[in-house]
Amino acid sequence: MTRALVLLMCLTVMNGCNTPSIGFSQVEPHSITIGANTFDVRVKEDRAEALRMDAMYGTPLAVQTQVAVQAIEEVTGCKVLPQSITGDPAMVQATIDCNIS
């Protein structure tokens, strides 16, 4: 019983590592690699989400966020509104503006 519980907990945690947020769960991802980092970017209306698919150990959060924003902008061809950026080291969400060049 204990082994089954531990296995279930591990699978639950691992499943959360590359799962989009609820608002983007039905959106098909666009994979993009920037440098050594791969992201799944999902776009829904004027919002985008970049989900990092690999690790960036020891990299400052500001740098991780900047790379995720670059991934969103390259996939969408739109600009990310800086004041709209939210998230954590693994997932960044932002509002995009496709009328800004």
Protein language model regions, located:
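Sec-dependent bacterial lipoprotein signal peptides
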Residues: 1-20
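Signal peptide cleavage region of secreted peptide precursors
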Residues: 18-28
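Intrinsically disordered, glycine/charged-rich N-terminal periplasmic/extracytoplasmic linker segments
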Residues: 49-101
